[in-house]
């Protein structure tokens, strides 16, 4: 039996969205679910206790960054990532591939792997499917990701075709190199750019390899949202119904709703934590940029409909002061709020699926959030 399994609870009669439970060695979580990103073994400014309080059920770690610092050997010595960071819930680690392709301009792709330069000190590094598996086995995450090639968007058709074929070959090598399948589930990553036939080919090739779960990669990288939705909708039909489906890099409220409707179960993104550090807050009325002068004497909470720690205790004026003064506590407060907002949104999505009314919920949410249902602007 694989380390991670998917239990289907129901399908929304109105939208076709899925309600399910993903079972892992470190606990189970309901889907659709948003996963906060803890790049360097921490969700920036948040303690594990605070993550539990806002009902985060699963978090991400980043293989590339943890390999470079502090090193997978140190984390293995500590008993794995869960013990190292004192998080007893599920953890998903990415393969390191996205960072290699996005952070390093000086890279050389061969069949063996990718040679590239360290993103800060310029030293020469090499990452292969086997090396990615070794690092992730050392980290001990519940869900590991296969090492894939991430073609830029847009890219020439022939380049993307060769890229997905290499991704499939690398996926086979990942399966062969994976040392702990009884403890850790390895997910395959479907690529294909914005080409429907290549997405289909990539999905079918990877499904033949029988991974315990599948991700859609290479989207949410700057393409218009209608293109992303079209690719998700097309690819979903070739993904197994009895396994988790993970859409990588998606975290805006509108996209979480739209892609839940299109059958996705798991999402991650640095968006809520990254914009929090700039003082941008997600609210039920849309985005709020707390640095704006009009909030200097505004004693209301960030969102009057929110019951998070930040909104129950602090005013816009105070949070604006902290952010303007570059006080760390301000970033903590906006981070707590943004993550709570998205996790509560996912809870609302799951409830709407239970009640067979996700399309109605989408319309209500978009109207309040200031989005046009027919043509949502990029949020």
UniProtKB/Swiss-Prot annotation:
Q: Which residues bind substrate?
A: 94-98, 148, 191, 218
Organism of this sequence? Staphylococcus aureus (strain bovine RF122 / ET3-1)
Query: Entry's SUPFAM superfamilies?
Result: tRNA-guanine transglycosylase
Q: In which pathway does it act?
A: tRNA modification; tRNA-queuosine biosynthesis
Record EC number? 2.4.2.29
**UniProt subunit comment:** Homodimer. Within each dimer, one monomer is responsible for RNA recognition and catalysis, while the other monomer binds to the replacement base PreQ1.
Q: Which GO terms describe its molecular function?
A: metal ion binding; tRNA-guanosine(34) queuine transglycosylase activity
Q: What is the official name of this protein in its record?
A: Queuine tRNA-ribosyltransferase
**The keyword Ion transport is annotated on this UniProt entry:** no
* CC cofactor note: Binds 1 zinc ion per subunit.
Q: Which residues form the active site?
A: 94, 268
Task: Spell out the reaction equation it catalyses.
Answer: 7-aminomethyl-7-carbaguanine + guanosine(34) in tRNA = 7-aminomethyl-7-carbaguanosine(34) in tRNA + guanine
Which cofactors are reported in the record for this sequence? Zn(2+)
Family in the record: Belongs to the queuine tRNA-ribosyltransferase family.
Residues the entry annotates as binding Zn(2+)? 306, 308, 311, 337
Where is region (RNA binding) located? 249-255, 273-277
Q: Name one GO cellular component term.
A: cytosol
Q: Which gene encodes it?
A: tgt
Q: What is the lineage of its organism?
A: Bacteria, Bacillati, Bacillota, Bacilli, Bacillales
Keyword set, alphabetical order = Glycosyltransferase, Metal-binding, Queuosine biosynthesis, Transferase, tRNA processing, Zinc
Say what the protein does.
Catalyzes the base-exchange of a guanine (G) residue with the queuine precursor 7-aminomethyl-7-deazaguanine (PreQ1) at position 34 (anticodon wobble position) in tRNAs with GU(N) anticodons (tRNA-Asp, -Asn, -His and -Tyr). Catalysis occurs through a double-displacement mechanism. The nucleophile active site attacks the C1' of nucleotide 34 to detach the guanine base from the RNA, forming a covalent enzyme-RNA intermediate. The proton acceptor active site deprotonates the incoming PreQ1, allowing a nucleophilic attack on the C1' of the ribose to form the product.
């Amino acid at each position: 039996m694989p380390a991670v399994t998917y239990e289907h609870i129901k399908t929304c009669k109105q939208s076709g969205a899925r309600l399910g439970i993903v079972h892992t060695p470190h606990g189970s979580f309901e889907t659709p679910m948003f996963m906060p990103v803890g790049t360097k073994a921490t969700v920036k400014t948040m303690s594990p206790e605070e993550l539990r309080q806002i009902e985060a059920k699963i978090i991400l770690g980043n293989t590339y960054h943890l390999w470079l610092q502090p090193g997978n050997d140190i984390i293995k010595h500590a008993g794995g990532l869960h013990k190292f960071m004192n998080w007893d819930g599920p953890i998903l680690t990415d393969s390191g591939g996205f960072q290699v392709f996005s952070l390093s301009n000086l890279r050389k792709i061969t069949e063996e792997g990718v040679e590239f330069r360290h993103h800060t000190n310029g030293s020469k590094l090499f990452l292969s499917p086997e090396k990615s598996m070794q690092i992730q086995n050392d980290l001990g995450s519940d869900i590991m990701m296969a090492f894939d090639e991430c073609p830029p968007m847009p890219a020439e058709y022939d380049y993307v075709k060769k890229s997905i074929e290499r991704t499939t070959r690398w996926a086979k090598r990942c399966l062969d190199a994976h040392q702990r399948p009884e403890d850790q589930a390895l997910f395959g990553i479907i690529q294909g750019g914005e080409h429907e036939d290549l997405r289909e080919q990539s999905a079918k090739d990877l499904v033949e390899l029988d991974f315990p779960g599948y991700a859609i990669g290479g989207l949410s990288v700057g393409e218009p949202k209608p293109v992303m939705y079209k690719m998700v909708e097309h690819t979903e039909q070739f993904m197994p119904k009895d396994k988790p489906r993970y859409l990588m890099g998606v975290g805006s409220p509108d996209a979480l709703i739209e892609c839940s409707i299109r059958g996705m179960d798991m999402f991650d993104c640095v968006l809520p934590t990254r914009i929090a550090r700039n003082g941008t807050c997600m609210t039920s009325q849309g985005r709020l940029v707390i640095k704006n002068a009009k909030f200097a004497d505004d004693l209301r909470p960030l969102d009057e409909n929110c019951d998070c720690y930040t909104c129950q205790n602090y005013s816009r004026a105070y949070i604006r002061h902290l952010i303007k003064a570059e006080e760390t506590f301000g970033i903590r407060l906006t981070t707590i709020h943004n993550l709570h907002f998205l996790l509560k949104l996912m809870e609302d999505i799951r409830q709407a699926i239970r009640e067979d009314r996700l399309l109605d919920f989408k319309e209500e949410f978009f109207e309040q959030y200031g989005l046009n249902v027919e043509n949502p602007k990029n949020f």
